[in-house]
Amino acid sequence: MARISGVDIPREKRVEIALTYIYGVGLTRSQKILASTGVSPDTRVKDLSDADVQKLRAAAETFTLEGDLRRQEGMAMKRLQDIGCLRGRRHRMGLPVRGQRTRTNARTRRGARKTVAGKKK
């Protein structure tokens, strides 16, 4: 397995898809990395030469990826919470941040339903 940005990318997949296993690299960024290095997107990871892997590693390091990106996102959320703005409070309460409705839906953000006992007759 080739190791890029601290992630073992799968050997059997095409390079274009394998790069998306790195946190912060989607299909578009993967294509940009491949275009800048001149590696064919259709090549399998197992067929890459060591020089190609080094080129990919160098190109990937120009972006904020993996742990640094997670830390950056966490710090941005913490900053919002510290200044006490609405977005920060919504993050803290585990509710949708961008104005979505919560009377119905929002199950992903709020978690599973907490069942309340019905009224006895």
From Swiss-Prot:
InterPro entries, sorted: Rbsml_uS13_C, Ribosomal_uS13, Ribosomal_uS13-like_H2TH, Ribosomal_uS13_bac-type, Ribosomal_uS13_CS
Q: What are the recorded Gene Ontology BP terms?
A: translation
List the residue ranges of the region (Disordered): 99-121
Q: Which UniProt keywords apply?
A: Ribonucleoprotein, Ribosomal protein, RNA-binding, rRNA-binding, tRNA-binding
Name the PROSITE patterns on file.
RIBOSOMAL_S13_1, RIBOSOMAL_S13_2
Single GO MF descriptor: tRNA binding
Give a Gene Ontology cellular component term annotated to this protein.
cytosol
Q: Which NCBIfam families match?
A: uS13_bact
Q: Which family does it belong to?
A: Belongs to the universal ribosomal protein uS13 family.
Protein function:
Located at the top of the head of the 30S subunit, it contacts several helices of the 16S rRNA. In the 70S ribosome it contacts the 23S rRNA (bridge B1a) and protein L5 of the 50S subunit (bridge B1b), connecting the 2 subunits; these bridges are implicated in subunit movement. Contacts the tRNAs in the A and P-sites.
Read off the PANTHER family from this record: 30S RIBOSOMAL PROTEIN S13/40S RIBOSOMAL PROTEIN S18, SMALL RIBOSOMAL SUBUNIT PROTEIN US13M
Name it.
Answer: Small ribosomal subunit protein uS13
Identify the gene encoding this protein: rpsM
